[in-house]
Every structure is written in structure tokens, then in C-alpha cells.
Amino acid sequence: MAGAIIENMGTKKLCIVGGILLVFQIIAFLVGGLIAPGPTTAVSYMSVKCVDARKNHHKTKWFVPWGPNHCDKIRDIEEAIPREIEANDIVFSVHIPLPHMEMSPWFQFMLFILQLDIAFKLNNQIRENAEVSMDVSLAYRDDAFAEWTEMAHERVPRKLKCTFTSPKTPEHEGRYYECDVLPFMEIGSVAHKFYLLNIRLPVNEKKKINVGIGEIKDIRLVGIHQNGGFTKVWFAMKTFLTPSIFIIMVWYWRRITMMSRPPVLLEKVIFALGISMTFINIPVEWFSIGFDWTWMLLFGDIRQGIFYAMLLSFWIIFCGEHMMDQHERNHIAGYWKQVGPIAVGSFCLFIFDMCERGVQLTNPFYSIWTTDIGTELAMAFIIVAGICLCLYFLFLCFMVFQVFRNISGKQSSLPAMSKVRRLHYEGLIFRFKFLMLITLACAAMTVIFFIVSQVTEGHWKWGGVTVQVNSAFFTGIYGMWNLYVFALMFLYAPSHKNYGEDQSNGDLGVHSGEELQLTTTITHVDGPTEIYKLTRKEAQE
């Protein structure tokens, strides 16, 4: 009888395989912690207040904060009063990056948040539910002396959430409100060297536009982009892991097709998991260095969603295939209650992502969180996905409990077996429990490292060595799930090692009733694995 490799592998060989995988896991963490820089960099920008004194404020002119063709600018709003400069004449200009620097495609993306400095004035206070409306233009160029090319031009509304902690009295005029930061812009590629933002705050009292928003003194931006050094390390890992997973996947499927039976459901799911992992690994990001592919962030989200949906489905089916009877097993329809929440939750998160990053492909200033309807819609999708996730884990915990109970019940029949056969089945049970514990350890490690990366400063220093915790989290967890999928396809590939007839009927010395109980699910020579046969009878009872 041929089972999976894990069922025919000795403890010594299994430990050797585990040790090799552990070494690669440590290397994955060290690559991020010691070689790669931090994943992202945050840069603060202070806008420059330029003056547009032309009639009708023609939009084709770009206001540059510094350089040979810099704009006519004022230091503060108070300077505008004696010069009779109106609010509609002021353009807040931001040049990206800072002077004497260039942006690079290795930065992969740009994310900006906005902070308004609003002073308290008795005659110009922030009204309840106030909304600031910005007229924003984004341009780019690849040469310091070239003309600016418009990239986007949108009206950008944002709701203000500000509090004033001091008493609203004349002596506290001029103090700043404490305002929440606002989402401003996200671009999925950095294909150009220089970017320019021109932000206007047009005032129209008749239409109540930018009325009751306080006295805006300054506009600050914080730009976040991926570090080029981290990008190179990340691409290198993807380039290395892609052929590794692809080769083991081809080898795995070849061994399955060599069997005289069709693939069972669990084997198909493991193969699909390998495909989804390969889909994530394929380093298509290399093309983003030479092409302006703004959809890469959305594409990355979709790839991750497919992988996690397959991973969650595998855990359910892996448990179910060890507890269901022959009629229910090997059919995906038998898992509709457990897989259904995965499908619904994944679909909700996909719709949410399309509503956010999908729209940002044409409007980089869009955010679903800026309107009440958008916020409610986003929360609805997230809540439904959260409920589905909770239902999934309830199903999973119940199935894991059932499997362990079935195995524990079957262990009571082990003392009646011969020593050789008893040791054989004890080894099978140990390996099943071992894989379950490894799965829990991988999930726990993912959560732990995520929490650590959020609460630490991003790096640790031990003597003269600096460890980038956040980078180690990304490379380590990414490597861990690759190793997990690799181990699954290797250990659960069909083994070509057979138990001889003398072992089955002689050396193992099993009573006829026991033999019937343990082999009742065998339908042909290359039937289900040994652990399936061991647990099915208990599930039926």
C-alpha cells in the first residue's frame, strides 16, 4: 500500500527535512533584518504659498515653490492682507521630492496624508461637520528643466475633524486646532523623477464652499514610499522562490499523475495552493521599473487574496478529509458550509478593494472614507468579511477538535495490535498532529511578528548591529509561507514505497477484525492514505 511520503518517512529523515526548512526560515528573517533597509520611508513636506494674481486663474500655469522659475510667494497669510491678496489667489505648492533629490521607480508607490494647520479666530470658527474643498492638480516631469505635464486634476473634498482644547476666548486667538490627519493621495507607481502638487482652496460664499473651515495657515503633507533597497531585496526573494515552488509543484503533480487512480480532493487542493503561491511569487514587479503600471498595488492585493482564500480552504479540507465518511469525502460540495464564508468574505474584501484602489487608478485623490455613504459602505463590507472570518474559525476549531477526538478514540485500539503495526500507526498519528501544530505555529508567528512590527520603533540595536524588525517581518513571513507550501507538496506527495504483503499479513500480525476495521476504505491499490483509513471508522461510529 503506497501512502504519502510523510507516512513512509522515518523520524530521522523527517527531522532532517524539518531542520533544513528551519535553516531557510532563519535565513529569510536574517535577509530582512540584516541586509534590507526599512520597508518604507516617510518624508514631511511643507507647502509654499504661491500667489496667482492673474484674472480667472488660468489652470495651465504651474506654480513651483523653488528653483529658477519659482513662483511669487508669501511667508504667511498675514502678509496677504496688506498686499490685498484674496484666498482664491493663493496656491499651496509642494514639490516632490525635496531639493537636490529624485524619485525612483524602485520606490514602487507613493502614499500621502494631509495635515491642516488651522488657527482659531472668534469670527471664523470651524463649523460642525465642516468640509474643506480643495482644487488639486498633479504634474510630473523627468528633467529639471522640462515642462510640467498634468497627471491629474480633481476637486478633493475632505471632512474636518478638529477640536480646540483651550477656551474660545479672545486671548486664545491664534492657537491651532487639533485636527485629524486626512487621506490625500495614493499612486501605485513612481515612474517619474519629479512631481508637483498645486492645491487651491477656492472660496464661494454663495455656494457655501470653504466657508466655516477656520483660518488655514499652512498645509503639510507626509509622503510615504517603499525604500529602493528593500524593493531590490524583495524582488530578489521573489526571483529565487518562484522557480523553487514551481519545480516542487511540477514534481508533486507528476507523482500524482503516475498513480493508477485519479487525484483525490486533498491532493488537488494542495496543488491549487502551490499554484496560488507561485502566482504570488512571479516577480512581475520587475516590469514596474520600466513601465508606468499604476495597477500593481491592486494586482498585488488580488494575488494575496487568492492565496489566503486557498490557504483557508486547504485547512478546512485537510481536517475534513480526516473525519468524513467515504460518501462525503473527496467532493468539494461536502464543504460548502465551511468554504462558503471564505468565498463571501473574499468577495466582500475584493469589492472593497475595487471601490478604493480600483477608483484610484483614474483618480489618485479618491478615498472611500471621505464621504458618509462611502464610509458606511466600506464598514459594511469589512463587517461582513469579519463575520465570515469568525464563522470560518469556528468551523475550523470544531473540525480540528473532531479530528483529534477521532484519533484519540482510535488510539484505544492500538494496544491490541502487534508492536510493529502499533508503532506504525502511532507514527502516523504523530505526523498528523505535528502538521497541525506546525500550522498553528505558522499562524501564531504571523500574528506575533505583525504585532511586534506595529509596537516597536522599526529596528533594534544590539551593539553595533542594527536589526530592521519590519523588514524581517515581511521577508520572514513571506519565506515562511513559501516553506510551508513547499513542505506540504513534498511531504504529501504520493510515496513510491510499498508495504509488502508479508508485512501486511505476517509481521504486523493483526487480528482479522482489526484488519477489517482499518482497511475498510481501501478501494484499490493506490487508495486513500493510511491516516484516512485509521480515522474514517471512528467518524462513522
Curated annotation (Swiss-Prot):
Q: Can you tell me which family this protein belongs to? A: Belongs to the wntless family.
Region (Interaction with Wnt proteins) residue spans: 101-232
UniProtKB keywords: Cell membrane, Cytoplasmic vesicle, Developmental protein, Endoplasmic reticulum, Endosome, Golgi apparatus, Membrane, Transmembrane, Transmembrane helix, Wnt signaling pathway
A Pfam family name for this chain?
WLS_GOLD
Bilayer-spanning residue ranges: 16-36, 233-253, 269-289, 304-324, 332-352, 381-401, 432-452, 472-492
Q: Could you state a single Gene Ontology molecular function term?
A: Wnt-protein binding
Q: Which residues lie on this side of the membrane: Cytoplasmic?
A: 1-15, 254-268, 325-331, 402-431, 493-541
- Parts of the chain on the Lumenal side: 37-232, 290-303, 353-380, 453-471
Summary of subunit composition and partner proteins: Interacts with WNT3A. Interacts with WNT1, WNT3 and WNT5A.
- Topology versus the membrane, per the UniProt entry? Multi-pass membrane protein
What is the superkingdom listed in this entry's lineage? Eukaryota
| Annotated PANTHER family | INTEGRAL MEMBRANE PROTEIN GPR177, PROTEIN WNTLESS HOMOLOG
- The answer to whether keyword Transmembrane applies is yes
Q: Could you tell me which InterPro entries the record lists for this protein?
A: WLS-like_TM, WLS_GOLD, Wntless
Protein's UniProt name: Protein wntless homolog
| Biological role stated in the UniProt entry | Regulates Wnt proteins sorting and secretion in a feedback regulatory mechanism. This reciprocal interaction plays a key role in the regulation of expression, subcellular location, binding and organelle-specific association of Wnt proteins. Also plays an important role in establishment of the anterior-posterior body axis formation during development.
Q: Which is a GO BP term held by this UniProt record?
A: intracellular protein transport
Protein location: Golgi apparatus membrane; Cytoplasmic vesicle membrane; Cell membrane; Endoplasmic reticulum membrane
The scientific name of the source species is: Pongo abelii (Sumatran orangutan)
CC per GO annotation:
cytoplasmic vesicle; early endosome membrane; endoplasmic reticulum membrane; Golgi apparatus; Golgi membrane; plasma membrane
Transmembrane helix as a keyword?
yes
